[in-house]
Amino acid sequence: MFLIVGLGNPGSKYDNTRHNIGFEVIDNISNEYNIDINRQKFKGVYGEGFIANNKVILLKPTTYMNLSGDSVREVANFYKISNENIIVIYDDISLDIGRLRIREKGSAGGHNGIKSIIANLSTDVFPRIKVGVGQPNDNLVDYVLGKFSKEEKEVLKESIEAATNSVEEIIKQDINSAMNKFNGFKANKSI
C-alpha cells in the first residue's frame, strides 16, 4: 500500500497558488485513476483506490502547510504504511517552472511542510517529488502564496502530468527508475 500526499493549504483563497501545487497533482492523480477524494479524517481529505494494481491512499492534509506531518503520521500509523511507501509531492522554489526533481530522502530544504513530516515520521527517508515553481524576486511568503500566471499554468500542465506519471513509475517499478526517468524532465513549453 502507498500513501501519496500532496502538500498545500486548505481553503479557496489558496487555490492555484505556488504552495498548493501538491494539491493540484493529487487532483490530477485522482482524475487519471478515478479515485474520489471525499473522506475527511486524519486531519485531511483523502480517497482510496488503485494504481498499477497497488492500493493507494491519496491525501491532502487540511492542517495548513506547517502542520502537514500530523496528518501524514496519522494515516501512516492507521494503515501501517512504511516510510518508503509514502510519496510526498510539493513545490520547490529552487527549481524552474516546468522542472521536476525526485528524491528518496533528504533534508527539508527550508520547506516547512517537509520539515513537519520529517519531525512527525522521525526520518527523512521517504520519496518526494518536487515540482518547480520558480525563484521569488523578493518576498518569499508573498511569492509562494501568490497565484500562477496564465503562461505559468500552461507550462505547469506538463509538470503536473509528469509528476502524476512519476508516481505511477515509483509504484510500478521503484524510486530509482522514477529518478532516472523524470529527474531530467523539462516541460516543452517555457516562459
Swiss-Prot record:
<dbReference type="Pfam" id="PF01195">
    <property type="entry name" value="Pept_tRNA_hydro"/>
</dbReference>
<dbReference type="InterPro" id="IPR036416">
    <property type="entry name" value="Pept_tRNA_hydro_sf"/>
</dbReference>
<keyword id="KW-0820">tRNA-binding</keyword>
<feature type="binding site">
    <location>
        <position position="14"/>
    </location>
    <ligand>
        <name>tRNA</name>
    </ligand>
</feature>
<feature type="site" description="Discriminates between blocked and unblocked aminoacyl-tRNA">
    <location>
        <position position="9"/>
    </location>
</feature>
<dbReference type="GO" id="GO:0005737">
    <property type="term" value="C:cytoplasm"/>
</dbReference>
<dbReference type="GO" id="GO:0004045">
    <property type="term" value="F:peptidyl-tRNA hydrolase activity"/>
</dbReference>
<comment type="function">
    <text>Catalyzes the release of premature peptidyl moieties from peptidyl-tRNA molecules trapped in stalled 50S ribosomal subunits, and thus maintains levels of free tRNAs and 50S ribosomes.</text>
</comment>
<feature type="site" description="Stabilizes the basic form of H active site to accept a proton">
    <location>
        <position position="91"/>
    </location>
</feature>
<feature type="binding site">
    <location>
        <position position="64"/>
    </location>
    <ligand>
        <name>tRNA</name>
    </ligand>
</feature>
<dbReference type="InterPro" id="IPR018171">
    <property type="entry name" value="Pept_tRNA_hydro_CS"/>
</dbReference>
<comment type="subunit">
    <text>Monomer.</text>
</comment>
<feature type="binding site">
    <location>
        <position position="66"/>
    </location>
    <ligand>
        <name>tRNA</name>
    </ligand>
</feature>
<dbReference type="InterPro" id="IPR001328">
    <property type="entry name" value="Pept_tRNA_hydro"/>
</dbReference>
<dbReference type="GO" id="GO:0000049">
    <property type="term" value="F:tRNA binding"/>
</dbReference>
<dbReference type="GO" id="GO:0006515">
    <property type="term" value="P:protein quality control for misfolded or incompletely synthesized proteins"/>
</dbReference>
<keyword id="KW-0378">Hydrolase</keyword>
<feature type="binding site">
    <location>
        <position position="112"/>
    </location>
    <ligand>
        <name>tRNA</name>
    </ligand>
</feature>
<comment type="similarity">
    <text>Belongs to the PTH family.</text>
</comment>
<keyword id="KW-0963">Cytoplasm</keyword>
<comment type="function">
    <text>Hydrolyzes ribosome-free peptidyl-tRNAs (with 1 or more amino acids incorporated), which drop off the ribosome during protein synthesis, or as a result of ribosome stalling.</text>
</comment>
<protein>
    <recommendedName>
        <fullName>Peptidyl-tRNA hydrolase</fullName>
        <ecNumber>3.1.1.29</ecNumber>
    </recommendedName>
</protein>
<keyword id="KW-0694">RNA-binding</keyword>
<dbReference type="GO" id="GO:0072344">
    <property type="term" value="P:rescue of stalled ribosome"/>
</dbReference>
<feature type="active site" description="Proton acceptor">
    <location>
        <position position="19"/>
    </location>
</feature>
